[in-house]
Design a protein with these regions (language model features):
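Carrier-protein-dependent adenylate-forming modules in NRPS/ANL systems
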Residues: 1-48
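Glycine-rich helix-loop-beta junction characteristic of Rossmann-like nucleotide cofactor-binding loops
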Residues: 86-90, 155-156
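Conserved pre-ATP/AMP-binding loop-to-beta segment of ANL
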Residues: 40-58, 91-94
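Gly/Ser/Thr-rich phosphate-binding loop
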Residues: 150-205
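Conserved AMP-binding A3 loop
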Residues: 53-82, 89
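AMP-binding/adenylate-forming
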Residues: 2, 72-79, 95-147
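Hydrophobic alpha-helical segments in the ANL/AMP-binding
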Residues: 23-31, 36, 84-85, 103-117
Length: 207
C-alpha cells in the first residue's frame, strides 16, 4: 500500500529541448505550474519522475562541479517571478527579451516573469539583425562586456531597456561603471539555481 501511495504522488518529468520554441515552452510551463501537465526537466536531468508538487527539475553542476538535479515547486517559481517584477516596477503588458540558454533557471525565470505580465519574451538567442526594443532583459557579464566593446546592436538594445539584470557570474566594478556611463540601467543579481536564480538585486533581497 505504501508503495502504491508513493507511485500516486509522483508525476512524469518531460525533458525540454534546449532549442524549444518559446510559445510551446510557455504552454508546457503553464501546465506544469498548474499541475495539469508533467513536470519539466531542463539540462542534464536523468530522473523520469518527481514528487507531484514539483513543477521543474534542472540538472546543474552547481558550484562544486558535481552534477545534481535541483527541483522547484510552482509556488517557488511564481514567487520568484513576482518578486522580480515587483522590484523592477514591471507592469502588465511589458515585455522581456531572452538571451539565456534554456538549461539555466535564469531563462525559465524570464519566461515566467513575462507570463506574469501577460506577455511572452522575445527570443533573441539566435537573433540576426537589429534587436527589437523591450522593457527588461537578463544577461551574464560576458554579454554585457560584448555589448560595451564590440556589439553595437546589443548595446542599443540594453540602453533602451528599463532595467538589465546581470548575473550568473561576478560583475566587476569597472564593467558596471562602464555600463552606467553608457546609459544601461544594470541591476546586479546574485543567486544560485537552488534559490530559484537571483534573489539579491543590487544588494537587496527581493520579496
Amino acid at each position: 500500500p505504501t508503495g502504491a501511495m508513493e507511485m500516486k504522488s509522483q508525476r512524469e518529468i518531460h525533458r525540454v529541448s534546449p532549442v524549444c520554441v518559446i510559445p510551446d515552452l510557455a504552454g508546457e510551463i503553464t501546465a506544469a505550474l498548474a499541475g495539469t501537465g508533467p513536470a519539466l526537466g531542463l539540462g542534464e536531468v536523468r530522473s523520469t519522475s518527481a514528487p507531484s508538487h514539483i513543477a521543474l527539475v534542472i540538472g546543474t553542476s552547481g558550484t562544486t562541479g558535481m552534477s545534481k538535479e535541483v527541483a522547484f515547486t510552482a509556488s517557488a517559481l511564481l514567487a520568484s517571478a513576482r518578486a522580480s517584477n515587483k522590484f523592477l516596477g514591471a507592469q502588465a503588458g511589458q515585455q522581456w527579451s531572452l538571451f539565456l540558454p534554456l538549461t539555466h533557471i535564469a531563462a525559465v525565470n524570464v519566461i515566467i516573469r513575462s507570463m506574469e505580465l501577460g506577455t511572452l519574451p522575445i527570443d533573441l538567442r539566435e537573433h540576426q539583425g537589429e534587436y527589437p526594443q523591450v522593457d527588461f532583459t537578463s544577461i551574464v557579464p560576458t554579454q554585457l562586456f560584448r555589448a560595451l566593446n564590440s556589439d553595437e546592436r546589443l548595446l542599443r538594445h540594453l540602453q533602451s531597456a528599463k532595467a538589465v539584470l546581470v548575473g550568473g557570474a561576478a560583475l566587476s566594478p569597472a564593467l558596471s561603471q562602464q555600463a552606467m556611463t553608457a546609459g544601461i540601467n544594470v541591476v546586479e543579481t546574485y543567486g544560485m539555481t537552488e534559490t530559484s536564480g537571483g534573489c539579491i538585486y543590487n544588494g537587496e533581497a527581493i520579496e
